[in-house]
Amino acid sequence: GYNNLLFISAVLGDMSFEKSGIYENVFLVEEPEAHLHPQLQELILNFFMKNVQQHENIQVIMTSHSPTMVSKIGTKNINLIYESQHKLYNYPLVNSSLTDEENDYLEKYLDVTKSQLFFAKGVIFVEGISEAILIPEFAKLINRPLDMYAVELVNINGVGFAPFAKMIKVPGKSSGFAKASIITDDDRCSNKNEPTYISKDLDYDDDLTGIIDKIDHGTPSTRFNSITALCGDNVVKCFGAVKTFEYALALEPNNIEYLLDAISTVYPEAGPKLRKKVNAEASQQLKALMIWLFVRSRNSAKAQVAQALGRILQKQHQDDKNGVTSPFVVPKYIKDAIYNVTRRLSGAEE
């Protein structure tokens, strides 16, 4: 690694001096990150960029599999080489449909971990930490482990999916550099100006009369409809939960005890009270509503509940070979999102 650095410095130093009859210099480097730790990778990248800025007659073209370098170079300097239907394509991200503002947002957002999406065959974008913790476990339960299918899961910490969807799509082509799924909430009943609005102050032990009717008759949010319309093709697909992630999980009867166990792990006093109230209710929708409202009202511990549920599901996955009486059921919209970015196993529908 150090020998390569010395050699690269010598070559670029030589190029920086103008020579008679030579007007342009192109420096081609294959995987300069080889044998270098991340800090040195960043150092050599800055060295390249500084030389290019100081000497207009030098152009550096390098190939790389390093998320460290990709995260620092800037989206407009990235050319993706990808394969689709047994053909190779080149996609300069500068040609994407991203606005300058969206490019700036992505450059600030794409750290070393998230930049791994550029090397993936498939990408799943999620809203927050709960989904980021649990989706990999759900994928294992349906025999689609994400690592086996080269799928990267990206937590965008919000609902600003549009720049990512636009970046994935290659302008003028019906393909993208990867298949992508967006898993998000449809956020119905969130508009204060609509009669179906559900107050943010509502908790699980309040009077819930009429709330289920609001959810049943509520319409997906404008934000959800916008991202669904932007996707609308086979490159990036949007998969939405009815209301929220937690509510959708709890709508499956098998999942109630799993969720209550996870909640009781995090809330040893309040959890049993919730369990008693949920178990006394006959309506599956009301059970799901209580669980969602409980988690929503204690938002600061959502990640802890997800971690507790993740540990429970890991045990279920390990015990699957012995048979599980009431296995956790992955909601259909999440299964569809995972299937979208993974190849179906031969002869297996689910």
Predicted features, each with a name:
Residues 3, 30-36, 67:
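Catalytic acidic motif of RecA-like/P-loop NTPases
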Residues 23-25, 55-61:
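Loop/turn-to-beta-strand initiation segments
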Residues 73-350:
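Acidic, divalent-metal-binding catalytic cores of TOPRIM
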Residues 21, 34-38, 42, 72:
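Conserved D-loop-proximal element of ABC-family nucleotide-binding domains
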Residues 1-29:
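GG-anchored amphipathic helix commonly corresponding to the ABC/SMC/Rad50 NBD signature/C-loop
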Residues 63-65:
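H-loop/switch region of ABC-family ATPase nucleotide-binding domains
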Residues 11-19, 50-54, 141-144:
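Conserved helix-loop functional segments at active or binding sites
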